[in-house]
A protein has these predicted regions:
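A short glycine/serine-rich beta->alpha loop
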Residues: 53-54, 70-77, 116-124, 154-162, ...
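Glycine- and acidic-rich phosphate- and metal-coordinating loops
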Residues: 135-157
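Phosphate-handling active-site elements
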Residues: 140-148, 175-192, 397-410
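Fold-level recognition of mixed alpha/beta catalytic cores in primary-metabolism enzymes, strongest
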Residues: 160-248, 430
């Protein structure tokens, strides 16, 4: 383990380039950018926590949802891929029992006293609640947790649908796992992070985001037993055929004030399930749902009914997407992507917020994508929780320059990311 100044010099000299290539690819320009980014993070760590500390550097990726929009929390299927946009954390353990985290772009220094357990008043929806909840998750797993100081620099857009929260959570979990030798498996870390987000942060998320950031690659998950989900890793290299790029567009809206909208999707799906005597839609047969349709409309309302239909269709579609990827049939996969996008509009109804119809960035981005890509081998859909944030598009090389240019003309410079997928999950880099 090196001190921060030594490590900064080594990174700048290229000593750790092989580690960076494993995460970010071989492009020389990207490796130079990551060297500078890591060195800047080390400098900021020294600024806030002092020079000469023995440090380690961790990385946790964001994720692109490939299929299974709002199915995981109903014990259905999920399909997602880790991406090269990530959170980097420089960390050093301490002996005073406090966790201190400074995140780039945020003025506040989070300070958590680990002797104070349980959710704290006024802390929910703030990053401190996630840290406290993750600490509790480690304790519940029988692991002793100590203090650490960390500086984080995230390229995962906040409120963008690339799951910045999961990247932050997994970064914190990776630090504890690494600094204190806890030895927990990636899936166990993911469940701890989901617990923290649900119980301490107060957002009813599923598990797929955390699993993808923890494990890396393309993850197919069956959440029939959410405590022990069945996981299948599909290597990321098999997704895109030659000449096809995955673009993610930040429409410059934010998920940050939309927790109630997200929660309503889960609540309405579970309202349908409860009427049919079950807890979640994954426990309901589709035939029983259709048989009860008249009564469900009256008791639960049409939006809840439509969202339940979305669940059944999207769940079947996600399984078909997995099969298409495993068979190397990108055309079949792309057709299913388009179907998923249409379902978000018509059934799940999470492309825009019904109380703010003036702002429909996702709708505009999808319409623009259709105008450029229709008739090609590409595809487009909304991703993530919805209502604001990002869309994704699979863009053939012949249209990539035009697509990128048009998207950034409408949504601003730097809004369109051409992503690589990442095989590694949350890891200690150095």
């Amino acid at each position: 383990m090196a001190n921060s100044a030594q490590l900064r010099n080594e990174i700048a000299a290229g000593k750790w380039d092989d580690k960076l290539r494993a995460l970010y690819g071989d492009a020389a320009q990207e490796i130079c950018r990551q060297r500078a980014r890591y060195c800047a993070a080390l400098e900021q760590f020294e600024l806030y926590f002092g020079p000469g500390r023995q440090v380690q550097v961790y990385s946790a990726p964001g994720r692109a949802e490939l299929g299974g929009n709002h199915t995981d929390h109903q014990h259905g299927y999920g399909l997602a891929a880790a991406v090269t946009l990530d959170l980097v954390a420089v960390a050093a353990h301490n002996t005073d029992g406090y966790v201190r985290v400074k995140s780039r772009g945020f003025n506040k220094l989070d300070v958590i006293d680990l002797t104070v357990e349980g959710p704290q008043e006024g802390e929910s929806t703030h990053s401190a609640s996630l840290i406290r909840g993750i600490a509790e998750g480690f304790r519940a797993a029988g692991k002793a947790v100590g203090g650490f100081d960390a500086y984080t620099a995230s390229d995962v857009l906040r409120g963008s649908g690339l799951s910045s929260s999961a990247a932050f959570e997994m970064g914190m979990a990776a630090i504890w796992n690494g600094e204190y030798g806890c030895g927990l498996a990636p899936a166990e870390l993911a469940k701890i992070c989901q617990y923290a987000e649900n119980t301490y942060f107060g957002k009813p998320s599923g598990l797929l985001d955390q699993l993808t950031s923890a494990v890396g690659g393309i993850i197919f998950a069956d959440f029939a037993d959410p405590q022990q989900p069945f996981l299948e890793k599909i290597h990321a290299d098999g997704l895109l055929p030659p000449g096809m790029s995955l673009c993610v567009t930040d429409t410059r809206g934010s998920h940050s004030e939309l927790t109630g909208e997200f929660a309503a999707i889960r609540q309405e799906m579970e309202l349908i399930a409860a009427f049919l005597g079950k807890k979640v839609l994954g426990q309901v047969t589709e035939s029983a749902f259709w048989a009860a349709l008249p009564a469900l409309r009256k008791a639960c309302g049409d939006r809840a009914v439509l969202r339940a239909i979305h669940y059944f269709e999207e769940n079947a579609r996600t399984l078909a997407q997995r099969d298409a990827l495993q068979a190397g049939q990108f055309d079949a996969f792309a057709a299913l992507v388009l179907e998923s996008g249409r379902a978000s509009f018509a059934l799940c109804q999470n492309v825009y917020c019904s109380t703010d119809v003036r702002h429909q960035g996702l709708s505009v981005a999808l319409a623009l994508s259709q105008s450029i890509l229709q008739g090609s081998t590409g595809a487009w859909r909304m991703q993530g929780g919805g209502f604001a944030g990002t869309i994704q598009a699979y863009v053939p090389q012949s249209l990539l320059e035009r697509y990128h240019s048009e998207i950034e003309r409408v949504f601003g410079k730097g809004s369109c990311y051409i992503l690589r997928l990442r095989e590694q999950g949350a890891v200690k880099v150095i």
